[in-house]
């Protein structure tokens, strides 16, 4: 048993997400949920996001891991300096050459 303030950054992130999920909200807003987490925990976070989605709950996700975010997204928006430059389904954006080149490491 530890106080939240004594946990590592990744542990604090997991605690915050866990506390949010305990409330069983209809809308879950997550800002960079994978930030500072080990790859295994990132997988777990996105599994939980998938479960939440299957329960027909709404998630507003801000995430720099574009591939993971778009894989679970019904709808995606790509912003550059605060302006929406691309929008579409997660699947459409994953297939977009512009998104692949700019955010997924593909060569244009």
Regions found by a protein language model. Give the residues of each.
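Glycine-rich phosphate-binding loops of nucleotide-dependent enzymes
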Residues: 1-108
């Amino acid at each position: 048993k530890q106080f939240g303030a004594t946990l590592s950054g990744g542990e604090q992130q997991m605690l915050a997400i866990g506390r949010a999920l305990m409330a069983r909200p209809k809308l879950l807003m997550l800002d960079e949920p994978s930030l500072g987490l080990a790859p295994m925990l990132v997988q777990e976070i996105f599994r939980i996001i998938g479960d939440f989605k299957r329960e027909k709950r709404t998630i507003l996700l801000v995430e720099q891991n574009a591939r993971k975010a778009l894989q679970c997204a019904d709808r995606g928006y790509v912003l550059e300096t605060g302006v929406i430059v691309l929008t579409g389904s997660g699947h459409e954006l994953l297939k977009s050459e512009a998104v692949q080149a700019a955010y997924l490491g593909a060569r244009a």
